[in-house]
From Swiss-Prot:
Gene3D superfamilies: 3.100.10.10
Xref: Pfam families: Ribosomal_L18
Lineage, highest ranks first: Archaea, Methanobacteriati, Methanobacteriota, Archaeoglobi, Archaeoglobales
Record's GO cellular component terms: cytosolic large ribosomal subunit
UniProt cross-references to InterPro entries, sorted A to Z: Ribosomal_eL18, Ribosomal_eL18_arc, Ribosomal_uL15/eL18, Ribosomal_uL15/eL18_sf, Ribosomal_uL15_CS
Protein name: Large ribosomal subunit protein eL18
Species name: Archaeoglobus fulgidus (strain ATCC 49558 / DSM 4304 / JCM 9628 / NBRC 100126 / VC-16)
One Gene Ontology term from the biological process aspect of the record: translation
Keyword Coiled coil among record annotations: no
Family, similarity comment: Belongs to the eukaryotic ribosomal protein eL18 family.
Recorded GO MF terms: RNA binding; structural constituent of ribosome
Keyword tags: Ribonucleoprotein, Ribosomal protein
Domain of life (superkingdom): Archaea
Length: 117
């Protein structure tokens, strides 16, 4: 891994250790995707979240959430970062924007988490 962002390196290490400790393969997959080059990281629009996520479901995006499209479902979205428009659209729909670390603390087993890339 040749990441220069110390926060990202720490996040990847924490995700891998929590994945092993809690037998949660979703966190290992998220860590592996975050370890890839930035140009290969996920860029997910809110329209894709609207299409595939169920109301009140946890969604994790190992990358950035972008604001193209609309969303009407209240969804809890965890991502590395959000555009301003994406965050406001998710909040207006009754959803929650959070960091991946926050979702990991809230749901260490990774059950009921949908991975979007």
């Amino acid at each position: 891994m040749r990441k220069s962002n110390p926060n990202l390196v720490t996040l990847i290490d924490v995700l891998l250790s929590e994945s092993a400790k809690n037998e949660a393969p979703v966190w290992k997959e998220v860590a592996e995707r975050l370890a890839k080059p930035r140009r290969l990281q996920a860029e997910v629009n809110v329209s894709k979240i609207e299409k595939y996520a169920k109301p009140n479901e946890y969604v994790v995006v190992p990358g950035k959430v972008l604001g193209s499209g609309s969303i009407t479902k209240p969804v809890k979205v965890a991502a590395l970062s959000f555009s301003e428009k994406a965050a406001s659209k998710i909040r207006e729909a009754g959803g929650v924007c959070m960091k991946i670390e926050e979702l990991l603390k809230e749901n260490p087993k990774g059950s009921g988490v949908r991975l979007m890339v």
